[in-house]
């Protein structure tokens, strides 16, 4: 890739990142979400992907495209990413406007550049480069990019359920991770999930005088704090009985690989007591 092409890639990413696609503020960003999805779909066509289309929800469409020219015998890679971003609050802490991406030094600064428009764009530029320089991709590729990841992907599960044949693949690649340092990409084995729960504490039927009853009666807040603290052990693991029963443990070769490479990737000595992700 020559310097002119590299500069074009940066300009295209700047255009992509300039769309204010804050999904948590959907009511005021609907046109921006739709415009970004349309731009992304058009870019997929420009780089050589086929069968490009926009899928519901209309407010923040799912963008799909593929390249399946290797035939049914070749493996298929599914690339996932999202074009929505987090809010920019507080805006006065930004050195430059968040949706006017600028290059400073070796970095591009703008909302979404590191989550997830930049990572998503890396894969699109890799596809484009391979198609230009080699005329084909080494495997079949499907791409699915949504606009609701930052609000919990409320429509993604239904889309997957209703399009199993369309999304059938051998490997899925999540373009929403990080790089330990420049030119050293990371392969993430997994991310921590999220579990929401509501805990209600029933206590006294009315207010009690803290001076008269504070020593003998715990407050509801104190009880709640004690319960929350008992959910975790001192090492950060979950203390709820049975919580880890269905968690798949790393295979021996995976654990060995992590031990061998952890120090190189993090510049820290390997801690044998560190729980594997």
Language-model-detected regions and their locations in the chain:
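N-terminal helical capping/dimerization or prosegment-like subdomains
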Residues: 1-91
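Generic secondary-structure signature for well-ordered alpha-helical cores
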Residues: 18, 45, 132-135, 164-165, ...
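Active-site metal-coordination/substrate-binding segment of hydrolases
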Residues: 74-145
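Short small-residue beta-strand/loop micro-motif enriched in glycine and branched aliphatics
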Residues: 108-110, 205-211
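Acidic/histidine-rich catalytic neighborhood of metal-dependent amide-processing enzymes
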Residues: 114-190
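Acidic-enriched catalytic cores of C-N bond-cleaving enzymes acting on peptides and small amides
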Residues: 180, 189, 210-277
